[in-house]
Structures are given as C-alpha cells and as structure tokens.
C-alpha cells in the first residue's frame, strides 16, 4: 500500500470553499465534521463517491485567517487527474465560472492546466492517458466523462530534496521515475489516484508560512495499524524521525511527523473509511461528530457558522 491518502489544507470562508469544490470542481462532499483538536472549526472532506484514499481533499476553514506565504518546506501545488481529452472542457468551464487559469503546458509529457482556488491554493488539472476508463463521481452538472478522477499528485518545494527523497522511497515505497528541469518525480507502484509526488529543489528561497491557501499536511496510505506501526518504526531506526502517538480520526487512524524538508506528513490507515457513521448514499449531509464530542453537540453547533446549501 502506498501513495497519497489525503491532502489537508487551510481555507477562509467555509461556504465559499464548499461552493468552489462541490459546484465548480464537482467533487463530492463526503463528510461534514469538525477539527477534532479545535471543535469550533469545521473539517470538510471532498472526494469521490465513497471518499476512497487518493481522492480525498480536506479543509479547515478558518474565517479571517491570514494568507499563506510561498516558500520552501511547503506544498507548492496539488494536482487532480482528468481524462487526457478533457482539458479543453475544463478550460472552458473555468472561464465560464470566472476562474483565472494559466495557458496549458506540458509536464513529463502530460498536459497541465493550473489555477488557484478562492483562498490562493495552487491547483492543477492533469490530462492522463487511460483515465477516461476509470470510474468517476459526477455531481450532475459535470459530465462523468470529464469529471475529476482523484489526485494526480503533489509538488513539494524544498531547499534540499535529498533526505525527503529517502523518506519517500524507504518509508512509503515510492521510486524515482523521472526528472524534468527542477522537478524530481516519484511514483507509487500500481497506484493511480494519488500515486505521484514531485520534489522541486530551490536554493535561496525563504521558508514558507502557513495560512489561508496553504496545505497543512500530506497524508500517505497505510493498509492498517500494523503497516502504520512498521512505517513509524522505520522512521526512527532509519531516519531518526519520530512520529506522534496514534490519533483516532474516526474515518482513519493517524500518526504525524515532519519530514526533513519541513513538510508535515501523516501516515493514515485506509480503514475504516467514511461510511462508518453514515450510509454512502447520504455522505456529507449531516454534521458528524466523534463519540467524545457528541455530548457537546449543541454547544459546538452554536459556534459553527451556518452553511445554507452545504
């Protein structure tokens, strides 16, 4: 098991975030819950029909949060997969929605359309050969043949990529497959959604600062608790890096560590998944709370902003 489990980022206004990712990009709203460590803040999960690992983008919407600052030790870009012939559809859709985008370019032989979300998070759509044969969630507005197929991958901006590369290969089983300009590409064997990580090494750039539009952390997959524990042991033994104690996030179990380049990484289990507390048919409809917060539901609901239409 390898590749990206989910990406968690910081947003500003929650309703604006919801509208952009569900209506403009057509992702499914998989879960409406709260930040377990800060229950006065929502935690939104977007993904495919069931929220499979490799499709999940999550947000902490902090109204009034200052903008993040680009720099090393941060995620530079989060990219989604779409069918290779769908970029013209997406360029037209973004234009119709008033979303600015850059002229399409090619990276590693694939067409790429780059743009930013309402909070300044750098995003890309990558046309992938063969993706048209993969299943996709459709919101009824975006035709299934053009819909997003989960993550393509992420690009990390680093002052020195050497030690980060060793963590990717030794702990997560990725392998270096290509280099292009300042980018080094790593791939997870056999994985489609979320199978790629690019490292961009830049000398002399100041360290980034987290805020609105920043990625908070990147989570990588572990099949279960046992595989997660083995990864954590290897982190200490092979790299001198210590993960946190395991935290139960209800839909997966997590440990966290900061990789040598400064990016916060998580190792998240594939189990139990998002249908553990509501049926697949109604995912994202109701506010779901973990058992330890359920006694405080009325208090929590009173401080959360209203989400009409979410």
Identify the role of each PLM range:
Residues 13, 48, 82-84, 117, ...:
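Non-catalytic surface loops within mature trypsin-like serine protease
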Residues 10-53, 96, 104-114, 156-200, ...:
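Core segments of cupin and vicinal oxygen chelate
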Residues 31-36, 46-80:
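Conserved donor-binding loop and adjoining core beta-sheet/short helix segment
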Residues 1-16, 75-82, 130-165, 211-221, ...:
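N-terminal beta-strand motif that seeds the catalytic metal site of vicinal oxygen chelate
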Residues 145-232, 236-242, 259:
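Surface-exposed interaction/gating patches
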Residues 65-67, 132-139, 202-207:
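A short, acidic/glycine-rich surface segment
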Residues 2-12, 33, 63-159, 179-198, 233, ...:
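Vicinal oxygen chelate
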């Amino acid at each position: 098991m390898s590749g990206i489990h989910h990406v968690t980022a910081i947003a500003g206004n929650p309703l604006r975030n919801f509208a952009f990712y569900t209506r403009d990009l057509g992702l499914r709203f998989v879960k409406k819950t709260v930040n377990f460590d800060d229950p006065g803040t929502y935690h939104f999960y977007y993904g495919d029909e069931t929220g499979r690992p490799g499709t999940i983008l999550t947000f902490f919407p902090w109204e009034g949060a200052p903008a993040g600052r680009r720099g090393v030790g941060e995620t530079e870009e989060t990219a989604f997969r779409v069918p290779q012939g769908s970029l013209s559809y997406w360029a037209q859709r973004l234009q119709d929605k008033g979303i600015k985008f850059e002229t399409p370019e090619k990276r590693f032989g694939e067409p790429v359309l780059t743009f930013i979300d309402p909070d300044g998070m750098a995003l890309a759509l990558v046309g992938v050969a063969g993706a048209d044969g993969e299943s996709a969630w459709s919101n009824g507005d975006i035709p299934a043949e053009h819909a997003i197929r989960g993550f393509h991958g992420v690009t990390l901006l680093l002052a020195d990529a050497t030690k980060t590369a060793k963590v990717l290969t030794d702990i997560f089983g990725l392998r270096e497959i290509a280099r292009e300009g300042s980018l080094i590409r790593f791939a997870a064997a056999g994985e489609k959604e979320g199978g790629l990580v690019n490292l961009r090494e830049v000398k002399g750039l100041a360290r980034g600062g987290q805020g609105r539009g920043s990625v908070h952390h990147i989570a990588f997959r572990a099949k279960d608790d046992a595989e997660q524990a083995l990864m954590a042991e290897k982190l200490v033994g092979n790299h001198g890096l210590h993960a946190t104690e395991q935290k139960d996030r209800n839909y997966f179990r997590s440990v966290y560590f900061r990789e040598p380049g400064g990016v916060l990484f998580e190792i998240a289990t594939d189990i139990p998944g998002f249908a553990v507390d509501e049926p697949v048919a109604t995912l994202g409809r109701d506010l779901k709370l973990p058992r330890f917060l359920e006694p405080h539901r009325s208090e929590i609901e009173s401080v959360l902003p209203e989400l009409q239409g979410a």
